[in-house]
Amino acid sequence: MRVVERAVIACYLGITIFSGIAFGYEGAFSSGSFEQNPSGVAIHNRVLFKVDEDTVVTTLDVIRKLNILFYSTCPQLVDSVSARSQYYSAMWPVVLETVINEFLMAADAKAKKIFIDPTSVNQEIEAMFGRDLSPFAKFFDMTPEDVFNVVHRILVAQRVEGMMVRSRVMLKVTPGMVREYYQKLADEAAQITQWTYRVLTIKAGLEFLAHKIAGKVQERLNEGSSWDKERLTALVLSQGGQLMCSEEFFREDAQLSVAHRQSLEEINFPEERCGKVLEHASGLKLFVLFNRATKTLDPLDKMEAQLKQQLMMEFAAEEEANYKNKLHARYGFDPATITKLLAEDAPQLFSLL
């Protein structure tokens, strides 16, 4: 899976887990520097968070992450200053938070001696951008080494987070838990009715004629004969009317409008399948009910893998949050820092030229 795709999803469990955007670059820059690059962004570069004695997160780290994300998703707009301006303004708060988390995860990976070999990083870069990285120098003032560091950081962060989340989730989701979850869904399904039906509209030049035709259609349908749209249409036309037939609807209780549900519940199914004639501005309406059944689930053995995946996804989101909270506590990061950095009265982190 490419890094661009993993910016939106992370594969911790061999399944899809939604996460934040993840790119980054580690560097060391003075807190008072000011830089301008070809991307049309004036960077008010300063330290945003100190991870340890050797590593700090700076404004430039976030900008470089935005540069790669923008080029990965919108390469056709790379020379559009207005598009870049809108994109950076909208994405800055999200990327600011995730880049700090990424630095913390990379520090944790280093402590745990979890590494990504350079070959894997280069393969990822080539899969994303090909071998020509010159657009980064032209539009973003980024060297190939900068790009390498960004991709390397995301891969390292993904690996350590995946390992930490997966190991805990695998311990939580047991066969017994899957069976309990299945029974819960089965009990809920037993309270749901599923409806299969169509809505017929009948028109005629005179109101009494329309009612007469609708009565014949209702009678024909309740005789028990099989559904035959062509024969019904011919019947209506022979009586001087018009017939319009909806598609076949398959709905559960919660998906039905109040009017449709009321009309369907009045049908004495299965003794009859066509309800009473209803007047409507667009013509006379007939509800034709083909089936009404209680919702059932497939056997457990057919659903077990799917249910296990759902449970793992739920626990993964919880464990991901727990893992990041522990990192915040370990490295002394207060999430309120993000709010302070984004406050209206806070010093600008970057300007759009």
From Swiss-Prot:
Keywords: Signal
Record's keyword annotation contains Glycosyltransferase: no
Keyword Transcription part of the UniProt annotation: no
GO-annotated molecular function: peptidyl-prolyl cis-trans isomerase activity
Signal sequence extent: 1-24
Similarity comment: family membership: Belongs to the chlamydial CPn_1058/CT_355/TC_0634 family.
Full protein name: Uncharacterized protein CT_355
